[in-house]
Amino acid sequence: MRLIIVSGRSGSGKSTALDVLEDNGFYCIDNLPAGLLPQLAEDALINTELLQPKVAVSIDARNLPSHLTRFPELLEEARARNIQCDVLFLDADEDMLLKRFSETRRRHPLTNANRSLAEAIRVESDLLGPIADLADLKIDTTNLNLYQLRDSIKLRLLNQPEPGTAFLVESFGFKRGMPVDADLVFDVRCLPNPYWKPELREHSGLDQPVIDYLAAQPDVEDMYNDISGYLLKWLPRFAASNRAYVTIAIGCTGGHHRSVYITERLGQHLQQTLKNVQVRHRDL
């Protein structure tokens, strides 16, 4: 039995997440009262009509505040049923949430005559704090379009060949912001930049000319060896501590050359010693 709890601030992509899960065989329930979570887990577990039952529910700020405050206790009760229970928390920065509500002209569930949209978003953050604190996986949707969000959910939640900690090695560009859901961040902007080579500028770190250029740089090799040595030593400790998800982010200026090259090499190397290692290039 697998239960995925989807939460997050309004406008962050919860409906999209439920759509993806439903498309992949999950029985989905929107806006479940949090107080019913243990009973739902019990009912789904004993439902003999479902083979390998998969259930996904969204729990958001429309719940009773007292139920949201009790979420840690309710989650513990659900997990006591001996089921796999993952908490996915989606979020975006406040400016992006304001922009999305402005574009769609939808009403925020917590706005009223005495509370502005910006105030409602901040109140919602406080209400959902107990869920965010216990999230197994957080996805920042600020810079993701609909299709990228769908791909990210499928990659992180549904593409796990074996049980255990799921590791994601992700490249990114600092000019578009650092991924807020990263557990470990490595800055490789000090390395030689292929962007300043006219013949390499239009290529990415996946292309052989850039690979050859970076592989020949001593500083690049030293940086790669230091990062890979650190990860090979400490990632197994993360797995041993029962972490469900670990994201390793490698950043350069634009997210096209250096970070992509390092990320690809690290992903291939880590896949030889760890299970469930995935690679993603955010800004390609």
Swiss-Prot record:
- The positions annotated for binding GTP are 60-63
Query: Is Nucleotide-binding among this UniProt entry's keywords?
Result: yes
Q: Does the keyword Iron-sulfur apply?
A: no
Task: Alphabetically list the UniProt keywords.
Answer: ATP-binding, GTP-binding, Nucleotide-binding
Q: Where does ATP bind?
A: 8-15
A single Gene Ontology molecular function, please?
A: ATP binding
For this chain, the family text in UniProt reads: Belongs to the RapZ-like family.
What is the protein name given in its UniProt record? Nucleotide-binding protein PputGB1_0956
Biological source species: Pseudomonas putida (strain GB-1)
